[in-house]
Amino acid sequence: MGNCLKCFQSAAEQSMPTNASSPNSHNSNSNACQTATSLANCYESVGINPNANERCALETDELLSSRTPLKPAKANNCDTKRNSFKSLGLLNGSAPTMSDIITTAVQESMEVSHQTLSKLFDVYKDPDDEEMILTDGIERLCNDLNYQPDEFAILVLAWCLDASQMCRFTKVEFIEGLHKMRADTIDSIRVRLEQTIEMLKADAEMFKQLYRFTFRFGLEPDQRVLSLEMAIDLWKLVFTVQTPDLFSNWIHFLEKHPNIRRIPKDTWNMYLNFTEQCDIQNYDDTEAWPSLFDDFVDYEKSRALVSSGIHDDDNNNDDPLQSHVKAEDPGLVS
C-alpha cells in the first residue's frame, strides 16, 4: 500500500462534541458500598465520563482487584533510563494481543450487541468493499472520535482491534475488537481509548505489547522488514506519549546515514530494551546487541568528542558506521 502512513495524513476538520453521562449507581447500605459499586461498574457507561481521565487509575485498580494476584515484575539488572515505563503491576503483560488485555479488564461488565456493532460498521464501510473500512471510512471514524488519523490514539485503536495492516479495518476486526473492548458507540470507544492510553503510560509490559504490534502493523504485505522511512515514522508515533532518552539522537543518526535501508524485527524489538537498559556510557558492545546499536553508540561518542573540541569534524572522516558496516546485520544495506 506504499507509504501507508500517508493514508492517515488527512486532518479531521471537525470536532465532535461529546455528551457526558455518569455511571448508574446501585442501591447499597453504606456510602462505602456505593463508592465500591460505582467503581466496579464504571465500564458500564456508554457515554463519555467528564472525570474519566482523573478516575482512570482508580477504575483500573477496582476492576482488577478481584483477579488472581499478578506476579511482580522482574527486576532489571541495568538502570532504567525511562522510569515512566517501569511496570506498576497493573497487568502481567502475558496477553498476546490488546483484545485479550481489554477482555480481561472488562469481561464482567456490560455486554454489547453484535447487531449494534454491525450497524456501526456500516456507517464507515467502503461502498466498493462492504467487508472493509478503508481510508475514507477511517478518516470519517477519526473525525467522529475527534482525533487526527495519525495520532497515537488511532494506533492504540488499531492495536485494540488487532488490525492486520494499515489503512483498513476488516469487518471481523472491527466487530470482534469492539466487542472485546465492550464499546459500541463513538463515545464509549473514545472512553476506552483514553483509559487504555493511561494504562500504557503506567505499565511497561502492556506498552511492550503495543510496541511489538506496531512493527507488524507497519509491514507491507509479504514483507518481513520495515523500510527505514516507515520505521522512523512508526518510532515517532509509538513514542508519542513516552519519549526515551536519546530518541532524537537515534532518529538523527538514522536519517544521516542513507545506507541504512531497512529495519528488521529483531532490531525493532531490541531498541525498546536498549532504551530501557542502556545509555552511551554504560553500553557494552560485547553483549548481543544488533551491530546498528554499536554504530549508533560509536557515532554519539564521536559527536561528543567533536562538541568538546578535541578534534575538528571537518577533518574527521572516520564515521563509525561507514568504517565498519557489518554485513551480517540485515538492517544495513549498502
UniProtKB/Swiss-Prot annotation:
Region of interest called Disordered, as start-end residue ranges on this chain = 308-334
Question: Function of this protein?
Answer: Promotes neddylation of cullin components of SCF-type E3 ubiquitin ligase complexes and thus regulates SCF-type complex activity. Function promotes cell proliferation.
Question: The DCUN1 domain covers which part of the protein?
Answer: 112-301
Q: Which organism is it from?
A: Drosophila melanogaster (Fruit fly)
Sorted alphabetically, the keyword list is: Cell membrane, Membrane, Ubl conjugation pathway
Q: Where are the transmembrane segments?
A: none
What are the Basic and acidic residues biased-composition ranges? Answer: 325-334
Q: Protein name, please?
A: DCN1-like protein 3
